[in-house]
Structure formats: C-alpha cells, structure tokens
C-alpha cells in the first residue's frame, strides 16, 4: 500500500513539472524563415501564429507561387522548431514515469 501512495505522489509531482514545462514552452517564441529570410513566420510554443513578415523582394503580383512556397517554408520551419523543442522538453519525462 505504501508503494502505491509513493507512486501517486511521484506521479503528481511529475505532472506538476510537466505542466510547468508546457507553460514555459507555450511562452517561448519560434521564428521560422524561408530561403534568404524573405518570409519570416513567428509562432508561440503552443503553435499560435503571432506574425508573418514578407520582405518587399518576394512580393510580386505576377509570381504568387514563390510567395506561397516561401510562406509554407517559413511556417514549416517554425513548426519543426516547436516540435523539436517539445520533444526535448517533454521527452525527458517519459523515463521518469513511476509505472
């Protein structure tokens, strides 16, 4: 019975630590960039788009495809950074589970 109580205490402590790390991650800013930094997308750690900036050189009404491609590139770059940070932050807890 004592073991079960200890496991529950450990699980609660771990849950609080995880919540703290998730909160820290959510408050972080991630900046994704396209080739030559022509498009820059900024996200929070919980994957909310904060801003997107287009350099004048990429804004060409006759070439929308390049702008679209670079926008996707910048967004995917930022989301990849968030995923990496999430894995590093939250993956550390996987081996600490008391069961």
Swiss-Prot record:
Keyword DNA-binding among UniProt keywords: yes
Pfam families (UniProt xref): YbaB_DNA_bd (PF02575)
An annotated Gene Ontology molecular function: DNA binding
InterPro entries with a match to the protein in the record: YbaB-like_sf (IPR036894), YbaB/EbfC (IPR004401)
Keyword line: Cytoplasm, DNA-binding
Keyword Iron found: no
Location of the protein in the cell: Cytoplasm, Nucleoid
Gene3D superfamilies, A to Z: Nucleoid-associated protein YbaB-like domain
A single Gene Ontology CC term: bacterial nucleoid
Function field: Binds to DNA and alters its conformation. May be involved in regulation of gene expression, nucleoid organization and DNA protection.
Similarity field: Belongs to the YbaB/EbfC family.
Quaternary data: Homodimer.
Name of protein: Nucleoid-associated protein SMU_394c
Organism, as annotated: Streptococcus mutans serotype c (strain ATCC 700610 / UA159)
């Amino acid at each position: 019975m004592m073991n079960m109580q200890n496991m529950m205490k450990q699980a609660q402590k771990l849950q609080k630590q995880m919540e703290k790390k998730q909160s820290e991650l959510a408050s972080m800013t991630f900046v994704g960039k396209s080739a030559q930094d022509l498009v820059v997308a900024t996200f929070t750690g919980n994957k909310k788009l904060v801003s997107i900036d287009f350099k004048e050189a990429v804004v060409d009404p006759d070439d929308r495809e390049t702008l679209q491609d670079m926008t996707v590139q910048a967004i995917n770059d930022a989301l990849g950074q968030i995923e990496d940070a999430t894995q590093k932050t939250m993956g550390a807890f996987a081996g600490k589970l008391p069961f």
